[in-house]
Structures are given as C-alpha cells and as structure tokens.
Amino acid sequence: AIGPVADLDIVNDQLTDASMIKWDCLPYDVRSPNPLGTTGFAGGNYRSVPADLHLTTLADPR
C-alpha cells in the first residue's frame, strides 16, 4: 500500500505517470520550502515528486 508514511522516492519510482495516483489527500506543497529537512518525511524527498503536483494524504492507487 502507498500511504502518508511511504518513502516518496520509492513512490516516485513506482509511478510512471502522475495520473496513476490522485494527489489530493498531504497537507504539503512540494513547491514550498521543505519544513522537515532535506530528506522530507519518512525518508522521502519532496523534490522526487513532480514539481507541478500540488499535494493536499497520498491516496492508495489500488
């Protein structure tokens, strides 16, 4: 399952098209300064997510 604690680097690797997942659920904006440090949360890196996506909780794509 892909969820809020998933490593975004792994999530990004699994997604070949941003349309595969509905990015409408994390209260973060990838275009804003990373409030949790350079590694983001749960080991992920916000910059590994397409910069044009506005994240508002990661939805499970299943």
From Swiss-Prot:
Instruction: Tell me which Gene Ontology terms the entry assigns under biological process.
Output: lignin catabolic process
Its Gene Ontology cellular component terms are: extracellular region
Q: Which reaction does it catalyse?
A: 4 hydroquinone + O2 = 4 benzosemiquinone + 2 H2O
Q: Where in the cell is it found?
A: Secreted
Which keywords does the record carry? Answer: Copper, Lignin degradation, Metal-binding, Oxidoreductase, Secreted
Q: How is its activity regulated?
A: Inhibited by sodium azide.
Chain residues that bind Cu cation: H54
Needed cofactors = Cu cation
Q: What does the subunit section of this Swiss-Prot or TrEMBL entry state? A: Monomer.
Any additional notes? On the 2D-gel the determined pI of this protein is: 3.85, its MW is: 67 kDa.
**Under what name is this protein listed?**
Laccase-C2
Q: Which species does the entry assign this protein to?
A: Cerrena unicolor (Canker rot fungus)
